[in-house]
């Protein structure tokens, strides 16, 4: 005889919207913040993190996307631009992107773990595509459009990082897939206001 189903209780916590400010009320941080940055749209920010510290990236309004890079500080000081490598990560984790649990780490091209995923309230990201580039917009007819790769180039100059036409970033909250016809599809992000990814740094970054 088949086992009867067990009861399942579902709790839904909706995001709170402040009518006065016309903004969503963000959840409390999981830890006392050492550093807090609000990254405005079409911009990039840099910050430094020590091994063992946490990085919480929050989608403040829902259905927003964010490109993420992380460099090994020690290697960068030695003139080696070692950052998260999506191909190495997919190879070692055996999945499209890491998730909390056993297969949770992002690796660099030297096969060293850089960060690990501790918590992820969305579970849908992209590691196959560049951060948006000038060519991406030019192909659509938008010449000179602000793009993520050039934003990265601008803010990384102070670390003497060489500019690139396209960055192999971790594209957080992007909803991409490869369909049965081998076509890359892009759809609306699944993230809601207040959704986040929590990383732990495995190196000084």
Task: Annotate each predicted stretch with a short phrase.
Residues 1-205:
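Acidic, Ser/Thr/Pro
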């Amino acid at each position: 005889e088949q086992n009867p189903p067990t009861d399942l209780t579902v709790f839904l916590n909706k995001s709170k919207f402040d009518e006065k400010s016309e903004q969503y009320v963000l959840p409390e941080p999981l830890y006392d913040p050492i550093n807090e940055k609000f990254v405005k749209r079409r911009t990039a920010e840099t910050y430094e993190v020590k091994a063992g510290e946490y990085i919480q990236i929050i989608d403040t309004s829902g259905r927003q996307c964010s490109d993420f890079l992380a460099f090994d500080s020690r290697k960068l000081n030695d003139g080696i631009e070692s950052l998260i490598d999506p191909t190495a990560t997919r190879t070692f984790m055996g999945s499209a992107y890491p998730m909390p649990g056993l297969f949770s780490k992002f690796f660099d091209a030297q096969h060293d773990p850089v960060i690990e995923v501790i918590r992820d309230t969305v579970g849908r990201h992209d590691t196959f595509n560049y951060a948006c580039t000038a060519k991406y917009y030019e192909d659509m007819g938008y010449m000179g459009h602000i793009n993520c790769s050039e934003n990265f180039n601008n803010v990384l100059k102070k670390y003497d990082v060489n500019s690139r036409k396209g960055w192999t970033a971790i594209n957080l909250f992007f909803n991409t897939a490869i369909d049965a016809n081998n076509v890359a599809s892009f759809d609306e992000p699944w993230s809601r206001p207040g959704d986040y990814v929590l990383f732990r740094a495995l190196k000084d970054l």
